[in-house]
Amino acid sequence: MTATIDTPAGTQKTVRPSPGSKTAKANKRALLGPYVTAGALLTISVLLIGICAQLVLLSPLQHRAAQSSGFDKLRAELAAGTVAVSQTDQQGRLLRPGTPLMLLEIPKLHVREVVFEGTDSDVLAKGPGHRRDTLLPGQAGTSVIMGRAAAYGGPFRHLADLAPGDTFRITTGQGRFTFRVLDQRHAGDRAPTAPAAGKGRVVLMTATGPPYLPKGVLRLDADLTGAAADTPALRIAPDSLPSSELPLRGDSVVWWQVVLWLQALAAASAAAVWAWFRWGRRQTWIVFTGPLGAIGLQVAEQVTRLLPNLL
């Protein structure tokens, strides 16, 4: 804000506020206000659009690519007889999360999915995951397989359509096993009696509720119809997994990546807003659309790992 005063000679003189005065600070805030508001709105808009695009449009494509590569690797290892049949590989080391372990086929649901080792958000983005503190399907005892209900292909989205008596197959390094559904259960329902000695069971798990808005966990129990395979000892004790591998949990380890990408998005948004006001709208669209979109998708991909793993 400036002021004009009359001098004794009758002329006018412009008086500018000093840099540290309240008037100067108010002028600075008034100038920065539109930039800050526009930058914040742009950052939020890019983030929300990126998350929606990641979950609805890109995640099914990523799931399909992971299934294709996982199936090729699993088929080659099945042919060579090198597929892991326990919690460890041939060198005695714990299997890495994301290792393809088995093929799940549910004819009634038209599901044919490679199952990977592990159940955190990153692994379940590839397909169903085997809970690492349980036995493999076909062995004597209970095995747990978890899968998403909506995002990343939603392989278990119709799991509730299975009824008692329905069957499905699982192929592991020990052969092909058939399971017959016992029943479904939700939170608070009584679990069935544990399988008898020498018998096998699989529990399939996914989320309940509207798509992308999980409210609870659906468990489907199914018993092995034939004889159980050799059962190695567990190396990972039951209920000793990190929280990120439990149902409806996110992976908090990626927070630092989210923060870094958010900083990059905020910086890119600030540059885009400055260019919009000082450079030109057309030039800003041409230069910043690509970088903002790419950074927004990177942020969204990390944010989805913070969301419930059965989403």
Q: Locations of the language-model features?
A:
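Solvent-exposed, non-transmembrane regions of membrane-associated and secreted proteins
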Residues: 2-6, 27-260, 304-311
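Alpha-helical membrane segments of multi-pass proteins
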Residues: 7-9, 17, 34, 287-298
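Alpha-helical transmembrane segments forming the membrane-embedded cores
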Residues: 265-311
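Cytosolic-side transmembrane helix boundary signature
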Residues: 15-37, 271-280
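Short amphipathic alpha-helical "recognition" segments used for binding
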Residues: 16-17, 26, 261, 267, ...
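Acidic/Ser-Thr/Pro-Gly-rich, low-complexity N-terminal segments
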Residues: 1-23
